[in-house]
Every structure is written in structure tokens, then in C-alpha cells.
């Protein structure tokens, strides 16, 4: 307000100042005399009908500087007044606007509060409705669950009823099947009992026969021991006779060295008239040449008792096959030694052949057992396929597994015996080659020595050969015994079951 009063006072003073020169100018215009006609102040353009207000006259001639300044100041004063009026109007409008804004704010606040109140009420109402809806949904879910539970109960009851009916039907069928199965099993049991009775009778007969055979074996062992004792006595007598004969032959050789020329002129039949063995009695047999019996047979038969009986029969009936060559043969020792040296190739074969025969017999028995096991395996598989119950099938499967294990063990035994047989064949071939080489060397050495030396050392070398030959068969029999022991050890080392 103070600013407005100050501006009004300044405007009044400025207007009074401007009014005074305007008055003076008017007086000057009026009193001045000019030849020009005055320009109409209300018509700015001559050729147009445009008119101006008398408050703003136009002058046709140029004004002076002071007058121009006064007009400019007047124009400025008018502009200032207009601006003041506009400012006042603007202030009033601002005041009205501020009032209106305050009122509008109040109205807006009231409306906002009303809206918030209405929203709160609506939210509360909506929450109540939502809670009611949730409760209704929960009730619906509970009802649905109850319905599903009731349906499940009904289905379960129906399933139980059907299962009970099916069980009853299956039990009836099983009863009928069990009755038929029991009847078949009873029939099988009757057959098995009959077979068992037959087997027990056969076993009793076999036991009786075994007892009789054992008694016979004991008697035969006693007889064999007696024969061995008697043979030992005879062997000792034979050795004494041999020593006496060797003494006689040495004396004959010493006399023959003195009369070499006479002996050369005489026929060769008379030279060895005293060195011959006569037809000696047959009881002079060599026990080292007898076949060795070690629990298994050397002949094609598998019965040990039969083999022992055969040997004793040969001994009783004076078989020349079991006697020493020096006792039975009428050929001199020198000729026997030469013949034995020449036939050394053939003497190697019998023990190896006997071992091979025994191994082939063992292989045959093992293969027979394996074939029987394979037949049992087929029968068990058929029974497993035809078994009606699960328990019987399990028992049969257990038996089949045990049978498979035994078959594997039997196959291992067969492979071991075959390997050992191949090794023996290789060893026999190597031995034959070595003995052939040794015999060739000995024959060459004897030929060289016979070409260089006289007849006396030749007879001595033949005597040495004759001394070496009698124990050769016993050594071969010992080698056969060792081979059999190695076979037994190789078969027993795996701790396998032989019978099934």
C-alpha cells in the first residue's frame, strides 16, 4: 500500500510538470503566425478516412526537442499508469487466486478425506467380504475333501470286497491244485520208497559182498606176505649162488688169460660151458620185476582186487613173465647183457605206457562223472521249469547251483589231468631221446674199446653191464610210483570233491 501511495504522488507531480509546458506550447502555437494551413489533428492520413481520437492529435510539422521530450514523457507516464493499473489488477487477481486456491485446497482436502473415509469403509467392507469368501472356500474345500474321502472309502470297500472274492476263488483253486499235487507227490513218494527199499537191499548185498571181499583181501595179503618172505629168502639164496658163480667165473677168466691161443682154436660153444645158467627152478623170481600195485590198476580193469588176484595167479602158476631173465634163461650173462644193451630202446616204453594208461583211465572216469553231472543238470532244469511251487523251485535252484560248482571243479580236475598227461608225454619223449643218445655213445665206446683191447676186458665190461641191468626194472617201478604220487598230489591239492 505504501508503495502504491508513493507511486501515485510521483505520478501527480510528473503530470503537473508536463501540463505546464503543454500549456505554454499551446499559447505559443496560438500566438505564432505561419503561412501553412494547420494539419487536421484527428486525421493522420490525407487520402484515407481514418480518424484518431482528439486525445492523441497528430501534428503535420516537426516538433521541437522540448516538445518531443514532453510528448515522450507523457507517453511514458501513460505507459506507467497502465502498468500500475495492470499491476494492481494482477495483485488483486493474485489475491483472489490465493483465496480461491486456499478454498480449493480446503475443498480438495475435504474431498480427499471423504474419499479416504469412503475407501476405508469400502476396504473394511471388502475385507469382511473376503474373509467371508475365504471361510466359504474353506468350507467348500472341507466338503470336497469329505466327499473325496467318502468316495475313496467306497472304492476301497469295493476293492476289498472284490479282492476277498478273488482270494476265495484263488484259495479254492489252490486247494484243488494242492489236492492233485499232493496226490502226485504221494505217488512219487511211494515210488521213491520202493526205489529206496530196492537200494537198501542192494546196499545190504553190496556190503555183504564188500565184507566177503575184504576178508578175501586180508587172506590174500597174508598169503602175499608169506610169498614175499619166501621170495626174499629165495632171493638171498640166489644172490649167494650168484656170488659163488662170479668167483668161479673170475677163476675161469684168469686161466683163460694163460691159454689164449688154445681158446682161440676151440669152438665158442665150449668157452662158456661153465658160465651158462642151467634151467633154474622157477621159484627163483625177482621181486623188483613184479608190477607195482598202488591203489589203482595198471591193466584195463579198474578193480584193484582183481589185479592183485591176477598177479598172485601168475606167481602160483609159474609165469615166466614175472621171473628174472638170469633165472629162467639159459643164455650166458654176457650175451644177456649185450641183448639188454641192444634192447634198451624198448625197455623205456612200458612204465610210461602204464602211466599213460592209468591217466587215460582217470580221464575216462572223470569224463563219465562229468557226463552224469550234465545229465543231472538237464534233469534239474526240467524239474525247475515244471515245479508248481516257489519253495520247491528255490530248493531245486540251490541244488543246481551246487551241481554247477561241482561240475566246474570236475572240469578243473580234467584239465589238470590232461596237462599232466601232456607233460608226461613230453618227458617220455625227452627221456627216449636222451637214452638213445646215451646208448649210441656206449655202443660207440664199446666198439672202439673192442677194436683196441683184447677179449678179457670185453668180458669184464659185459659183466658190468650185467650187474647194472637187474635193478633197472626196480628203478622204473620206483619212477612209476613217484609219478603216481605226483598225480595224486596234483589232484588232492585243489581240495575238490570227487564223488557227487
From Swiss-Prot:
Could you give the subunit structure recorded for this chain? Interacts with FGF2 and RAP80. Does not interact with FGF1 or FGF2 isoform 24 kDa. Homodimer and homooligomer. Interacts with microtubules.
Region of interest (Mediates interaction with microtubules), ranges: 278-491
The species this protein belongs to is Mus musculus (Mouse)
Extract the ranges annotated as region (Disordered). 1-59, 256-275, 432-478
Any one GO MF term held by the record is: protein homodimerization activity
- Hey, which family's this protein in? Belongs to the translokin family.
Please explain the role this protein plays, according to its UniProt record. Answer: Centrosomal protein which may be required for microtubule attachment to centrosomes. May act by forming ring-like structures around microtubules. Mediates nuclear translocation and mitogenic activity of the internalized growth factor FGF2.
What spans are recorded as compositionally biased (Low complexity)? Answer: 1-16
User: Which residue positions does Phosphoserine occur at?
Assistant: 53
Relay the domain remarks.
The C-terminal region mediates the interaction with microtubules and is able to nucleate and bundles microtubules in vitro.
InterPro entries, per the entry = Centrosomal_MT-associated, Cep57_CLD, Cep57_MT-bd_dom
The gene from which this protein is expressed is Cep57
Q: Does the keyword Cytoplasm apply?
A: yes
Its protein name is Centrosomal protein of 57 kDa
Task: List the Gene3D superfamilies hit by this protein, alphabetically.
Answer: 1.20.58.90
